[in-house]
Amino acid sequence: VLSLVSTVLFAGWVLIGQSTSLVQSDQSDVVPAFVSALAQSPAKPKTLVLSATSSTTTFFISRGNPLSIGDADVATETPPQIEDAVSQLITGSGVSAAKVLGSFGIQYLFLKAPVSPESARAIDGVGGFTRMSATQIGIVWHIVGSSPRVILAGTNGKNYLIPASDIGATGKAVEPGQLVVAEKYDRSWRLISNGVNVPLQHAPSGLPVFSVSSPGKVTLLFDATAHRGLISLQLLTLLIAVVMALPSGRRRRQVPLEELV
């Protein structure tokens, strides 16, 4: 019974997502406050948080808020283009790193302390990164030419910002064009334009795009139903396994002496 109760409590803890849950992260605490504040703007800029030593390099993408179930960063893996750009950036060979990172809506690069002088010099030497600040917690660069999270590339050559939220975006398409989402391609992205579902397309850059044929209201959604369903199925399987492992409820006189000792 104790095992069953523990499993149920564990499942609730994971799904509810408290401050110490497996599906949340307090990674925003290590990002400078002004960068976290900028992440709340309609452009929803992201920050690449980099930790580099002489032997290892780790990174994650921060949106200024803790992660939770349903976020695109949880439901999908990190795009290989970003992994390659980070690898090239550290070695100083990433001439296109800023363009790649910027296309995925990453507007800032934060190198955490302790800062490796070699890594800092490598980033300074690569075009497209403008140093903004250097403090005891690390160094921040702005990525030149980075894209907002959601834009409408109009047919006249202009780009229009579509205000984004933590999950999707809602705004007005002032003219026909392509709505570009600065996220990894995933079939869970949905766009409704003037009440009509718009087919999802996969851009060569790896981004999800939608062709908007007429001006009007557009609503972008990330449908994580399948992802949540998979997690629920995994938890259900775990629960069944624990229940099957519990004592079968046999009478005491039917239990062998070896099991009672």
Regions found by a protein language model. Name each.
Residues 2-75, 166-176:
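Extracytoplasmic
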Residues 5, 69-80, 131-143:
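A generic structural motif
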Residues 8-19, 78-81, 131-133, 149-152:
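Short acidic (Asp/Glu) and glycine-rich catalytic loops that position anionic groups and cofactors
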Residues 33-34, 94-95, 125-127:
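Alpha-helical scaffolding within the catalytic cores
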Residues 38-107, 117, 147, 185-187, ...:
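Extracytoplasmic/lumenal acceptor-recognition loop(s) of multi-pass membrane glycoenzymes
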Residues 106-160, 181:
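Aromatic/acidic, Gly/Pro-rich catalytic loop(s) in extracytoplasmic/lumenal soluble domains
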Residues 136, 147-261:
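Active-site-proximal, structured, solvent-exposed surfaces of multi-pass membrane proteins
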